[in-house]
Amino acid sequence: MKISSFRKGRWLGALALFAVVCWSMADAAVDRIVAVVDDGVILESELVRKVDEIKRSLRASRASLPPDSVLVRQVLERMIVDKIQIQMAEKMGIQVDDDTLRMAVSQIAQRNNLTPDQFRRSLAREGIDYGDFLDQVRSEIAMGRLRASQINNQIKISDREVEHYLEAQGGSGAVADREYRLGHILIATPREASPDEVKKARERADRVVKELKAGLDFKDASIRYSDDPQALEGGDLGWRKLSEIPSHIAEVVGGMKDGEVSDPIRSPGGYHIVKMLAMRGVGEAKLTKTHVRHILIRPNEVLSDEDAKNKLLALKTRIENGDDFAELARGHSDDKGSAIKGGDLGWVKPGALVPPFEEAMNALDENQLSDPVQTQFGWHLIQVLERQESSDTNEVLKNRARDELFKRKVDEETELWLRKIRDEAYVEIRLDETPASPGEDAPAGEDSPETFMR
């Protein structure tokens, strides 16, 4: 009897072990790798989660859903490009601390007229995991800092470019006359496309234009066909001045009517199709000058990035407790040019400082101290002393022209840079079937996933 019980127990144990193994194998089979991207991977569970998120967003905006094979291709491509950028940011030591993350989430909540707690509950009602959301925001901030270091901070606008631009505008306020809201579809070509590849892209673009003019909704066409990063948002570029639009598109947009769809527009990145969604006039703008000072702590071989930030936090506490900003700047700032003046940078115009510094400065009230702000130069503690508005027409136009030329160059260079890093990365797509959402079957008759295998 005892032997029988022992054997029975051993048999049940073996069954239990077999069940665990089978469960693990099934679980591993479900959560398989769908793409290898340089040193990282994208899992099917991540792809399914992102596809579900996009589907919820499209349903909320009442956009029609494309076939799963099309949506999966778009979402996976975006995830691949994001993965490349995140890996680059990690290799460059770009980090997003918890304070920056909390501030970003708070700003997102404010834009939705919610408190942070209300916003968190709202995400839960939408089925969005809060931890996943935080990871996504952290990644977006890191990628933004990466692009700023690789693109924004490398762009310089010369006085001659500003003068030439104003001359082309007739030296008047024409730059401020109108803003345009555009829909955009990109049919991409490889960086060194062959004549045959260019021809096929043009033919594809012509087919898209034909469908649009036959009544296809632009948002649906963007989701289905566009290679642009905004494709899943329906290709809406938002409101832009003519000078903020890449030059190859701006030349066409200026003559378009409301609701009009352009013919394909050639650029180094492929063929662009734009739709004039709306246009509006712009009122008179004024130039805001800011009197600002800062303390810079630059990391080095001895002082780590985190130590530099903590040193600034300690200095901020001392200032809030009554210590003099100027004296601390003279004794601690690594910006020797301004340190001898108590950290004073004088009056600065828009566009004069690197973007992360300027964005933080613009968010401050007069006499308010910033939290530590990271730029390519190190960590900054910033204080705005005073602001002035100028209505000097010539000065306003020059600064507006400089700002708009900068935005145009950023857009053009970002498109090329994203294509470059995508082309140079090692990417192996292992998607041999369209992953359906839990409980969903792929609709019959959809395009085979092989159409987007590469």
UniProtKB/Swiss-Prot annotation:
Signal sequence, renumbered to the chain: 1-28
The PpiC domain is annotated at: 177-278, 287-386
Q: Name one GO cellular component term.
A: outer membrane-bounded periplasmic space
One Pfam family, short name: SurA_N
Q: Which PROSITE patterns match?
A: PPIC_PPIASE_1, PPIC_PPIASE_2
**Which purpose does this protein serve, as stated in its record?**
Chaperone involved in the correct folding and assembly of outer membrane proteins. Recognizes specific patterns of aromatic residues and the orientation of their side chains, which are found more frequently in integral outer membrane proteins. May act in both early periplasmic and late outer membrane-associated steps of protein maturation.
Protein name in UniProt: Chaperone SurA
